[in-house]
C-alpha cells in the first residue's frame, strides 16, 4: 500500500466523550487485521505541550520514549496498539504557531504575509503527513469539540487534506453524544443532528457516526440518525458505556465496524484476530481473585492524573487473573491520620509521583509504615526520592533531611538538583533552579543497569539492563549511597552514575524506582515492576 490512508476522528456536543478510546479501538482492529497503523492527536490549545500544565487542568502528562510530553490520549494509543509512539504523534496549536513563527524569522517564507491559510493550515497538514509516513493507515484525532474557535484551523486542514489525497484515501468519523433523558424515558438524537450540521457548515461531511450513550440504540433510532445526518445505515455505530475500555474494540467488532471502513477506504480482508485480547478482557471484567492496595497520592480527587498507573494496575490484574481494588489515600490528609487505621485492610502500598511540597509528609508516613510493617511497597519517581528521605530520617537518624526541591537550605539533601545530564539524544543539558520549567526535565527512555541477584533483577527476569521512561528534575544524591547500603537500602539500578532504583534487602517486597514503569505497560504486555508488586501483594494477603 503506497498511499497512506487517513481516518479523521472529530467530536461533537461536548468534550470527554472518548474520542481517544474510539480512535485507539479502531486502530487496534486495523492492526490486528495485518495493517501498519499509527495514531496522531492534534490538540487545539495554545500551550506548546502539556508539560507545565496542572494535573487539575489537563490530567496526566504522558511521556514517550523520545522524551515528548504529550496528551494522555497517547497513553491510550500505546496501550491499545502495543507500540511506542513519538513526538510526531502529538502536536498543539502552540507548537504549530511556534514552528511557523520560527520559519518566518529565518526568512523561509520569502517575505510573504503569514496567514492562517495557507501557512498555519499547511503546517498542520505537513505534520499529519509526517506522522503517517510508512504506515498503511493514520488515524488523526482532533481534540476539542466541533464549534470551538480554536479547532477551526485543524478542521480546515483535514478538509483540505481529504480533498488532496482523494475520496478512497481518507474518511471522517464523528463521535457524538446521544443523551438519555430520564424524564422522557428516551434517547435524544437532536444534539447529534446539530453537531453534524455544524461540521457540515465547516465543509466536512462525516462518513460514519459513533454514538456515545448510556443505553443501546434500537434500529429505528440508528436509521433516524443515518437519514438525518446523511450517512449509510451501517455507518451508525453505538458506543454504550462499558465495564472496561478494553471492551470497546470488541463491541465495535460485533457491530461490523470494519466493513464500511473497508468499503470507504478500498481495503480488503479486514479480519482481525482478537482472541488474546478477548481472553484478557474477560479477566479484567470477571477475575478469579481480588486484592486491595493503597494508592497514596496528592491528586486523588482527579484520578485522570494517574491514568497510566491505574491502567497498568488493570493490566497486572488481568495477567494475574485478579481484581486489584484501589484504596485511594490523599497524602495531604494522611499527615493528620493514624497510619495503622488507614492501612489496616490493604496488602500493598503504592506511593505515586508528583510535584511540590503539599502532601509530601503524608507520603513519607506511608513509606515508613510499609517499611516497618513489611507490607509490599512500590515507590515511583517522587515515591523513590521520599523513600530515601524516610530512610535517612528514621534509620540513618540524620538531622534536617529533605529534598532540595522542598528545602534548598536543609543540612542533608538526600535528593538534589543535578546541573548537567545527557538527554535521550546523547546531548548534554544544563539546568539550574532558575531554568524555565517547560521541557527542561530528564525526559524519555534511559538505560538502567541492574544489579545482579537483586529484587530488581528478579523482577526483570535477570536481564542486565532495561530502558524505562523518566519525567523528573531532581535526583538521588550519591553522597549518601554508602550509608544507605550499609544499613540495608541497596541501589539496584543505576544509569551513568544516577541512582535509578533502591530496595530493602530485609523486606518481602520494598522497591522504589526513579522511572515511570506505567508508561510502558500494555494490556498484552504488562510492565514487570507493576506486575511483580501486585503479585507480592497477593502473596502477602494469602499468607
From Swiss-Prot:
Q: Which residues bind L-glutamine?
A: 354, 382-385, 405, 473
Q: Which InterPro entries match?
A: Class_I_gatase-like, CTP_synthase, CTP_synthase_N, GATASE, GATase1_CTP_Synthase, P-loop_NTPase
Write the protein's name: CTP synthase
Q: Where is the Glutamine amidotransferase type-1 domain?
A: 292-543
The record lists CTP as bound by 15, 148-150, 188-193, 224
What is known about what this protein does? Catalyzes the ATP-dependent amination of UTP to CTP with either L-glutamine or ammonia as the source of nitrogen. Regulates intracellular CTP levels through interactions with the four ribonucleotide triphosphates.
- Statement: the UniProt record of this protein carries the keyword NADP: no
> Where does the chain bind Mg(2+)?
73, 141
Misc. comment: CTPSs have evolved a hybrid strategy for distinguishing between UTP and CTP. The overlapping regions of the product feedback inhibitory and substrate sites recognize a common feature in both compounds, the triphosphate moiety. To differentiate isosteric substrate and product pyrimidine rings, an additional pocket far from the expected kinase/ligase catalytic site, specifically recognizes the cytosine and ribose portions of the product inhibitor.
Catalysed reaction equations from the record: UTP + L-glutamine + ATP + H2O = CTP + L-glutamate + ADP + phosphate + 2 H(+); L-glutamine + H2O = L-glutamate + NH4(+); UTP + NH4(+) + ATP = CTP + ADP + phosphate + 2 H(+)
Amino acid at each position: 500500500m503506497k498511499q497512506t490512508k487517513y481516518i479523521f476522528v472529530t467530536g461533537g456536543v461536548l468534550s470527554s466523550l472518548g474520542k481517544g478510546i474510539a480512535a485507539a479501538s479502531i486502530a487496534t482492529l486495523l492492526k490486528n487485521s495485518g495493517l501498519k497503523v499509527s495514531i496522531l492527536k492534534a490538540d487545539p490549545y495554545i500551550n506548546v505541550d502539556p508539560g507545565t500544565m496542572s494535573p487539575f487542568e489537563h490530567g496526566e502528562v504522558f511521556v514517550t520514549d523520545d522524551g515528548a510530553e504529550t496528551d494522555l490520549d497517547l497513553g491510550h494509543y500505546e496501550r491499545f496498539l502495543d507500540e511506542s509512539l513519538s513526538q510526531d504523534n502529538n502536536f498543539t496549536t502552540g507548537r504549530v504557531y511556534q514552528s511557523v513563527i520560527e520559519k518566518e524569522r529565518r526568512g523561509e517564507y520569502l517575505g510573504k504575509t503569514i496567514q492562517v491559510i495557507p501557512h498555519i493550515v499547511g503546517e498542520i497538514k505537513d505534520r499529519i503527513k509526517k506522522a503517517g509516513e510508512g504506515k498503511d493507515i493514520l488515524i488523526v484525532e482532533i481534540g476539542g469539540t466541533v464549534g470551538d474557535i480554536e479547532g477551526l484551523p485543524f478542521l480546515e486542514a483535514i478538509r483540505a487534506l481529504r480533498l488532496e489525497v482523494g475520496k478512497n484515501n481518507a474518511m471522517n468519523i464523528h463521535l457524538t453524544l446521544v443523551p438519555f433523558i430520564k424524564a422522557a424515558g428516551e434517547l435524544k438524537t437532536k444534539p447529534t443532528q446539530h453537531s453534524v450540521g455544524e461540521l457540515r457548515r465547516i465543509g466536512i461531511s462525516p462518513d460514519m457516526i459513533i454514538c456515545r450513550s448510556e443505553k443501546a440504540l434500537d434500529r429505528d433510532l440508528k436509521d433516524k440518525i443515518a437519514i438525518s445526518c446523511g450517512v449509510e445505515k451501517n455507518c451508525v455505530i453505538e458506543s454504550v458505556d462499558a465495564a472496561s475500555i478494553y471492551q470497546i474494540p470488541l463491541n465495535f467488532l460485533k457491530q461490523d465496524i470494519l466493513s464500511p471502513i473497508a468499503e470507504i477506504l478500498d481495503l480488503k480482508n479486514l479480519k482481525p484476530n482478537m482472541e488474546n485480547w478477548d481472553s484478557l478482557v474477560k479477566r479484567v471484567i470477571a477475575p478469579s481473585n481480588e486484592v486491595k492496595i493503597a494508592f497514596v497520592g496528592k491528586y486523588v480527587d482527579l484520578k485522570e492524573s494517574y491514568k497510566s498507573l491505574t491502567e497498568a494496575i488493570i493490566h497486572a490484574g488481568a495477567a494475574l487473573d485478579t481484581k486489584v481494588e484501589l484504596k485511594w489515600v490523599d497524602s495531604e490528609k494522611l499527615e493528620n491520620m493514624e497510619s495503622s487505621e488507614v492501612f489496616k485492610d490493604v496488602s500493598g502500598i503504592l506511593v505515586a509521583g508528583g510535584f511540590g511540597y503539599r502532601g509530601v509528609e503524608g507520603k513519607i508516613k506511608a513509606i515508613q509504615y510499609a517499611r516497618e510493617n513489611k507490607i509490599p511497597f512500590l515507590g515511583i519517581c517522587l515515591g523513590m526520592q521520599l523513600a530515601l528521605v524516610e530512610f535517612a530520617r528514621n534509620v540513618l537518624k540524620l538531622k534536617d533531611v529533605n529534598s532540595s526541591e522542598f528545602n534548598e537550605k536543609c543540612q542533608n539533601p538526600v535528593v538534589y538538583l543535578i546541573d548537567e545530564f545527557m538527554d535521550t539524544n546523547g546531548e548534554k543539558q544544563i539546568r539550574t533552579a532558575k531554568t524555565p520549567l517547560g521541557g527542561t526535565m530528564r525526559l524519555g527512555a534511559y538505560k538502567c543497569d541492574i544489579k545482579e541477584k537483586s529484587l530488581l533483577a528478579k523482577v526483570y527476569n535477570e536481564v542486565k539492563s532495561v530502558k524505562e521512561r523518566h519525567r523528573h528534575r531532581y535526583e538521588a544524591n550519591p553522597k549518601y549511597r554508602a550509608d544507605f547500603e550499609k544499613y540495608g537500602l541497596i541501589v539496584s539500578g543505576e544509569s551513568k552514575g544516577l541512582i535509578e532504583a533502591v530496595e530493602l534487602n530485609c523486606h518481602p517486597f520494598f522497591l522504589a524506582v526513579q522511572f515511570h514503569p506505567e508508561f510502558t505497560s500494555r494490556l498484552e504486555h504488562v510492565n514487570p515492576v507493576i506486575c511483580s508488586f501486585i503479585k507480592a501483594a497477593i502473596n502477602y494477603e494469602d499468607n
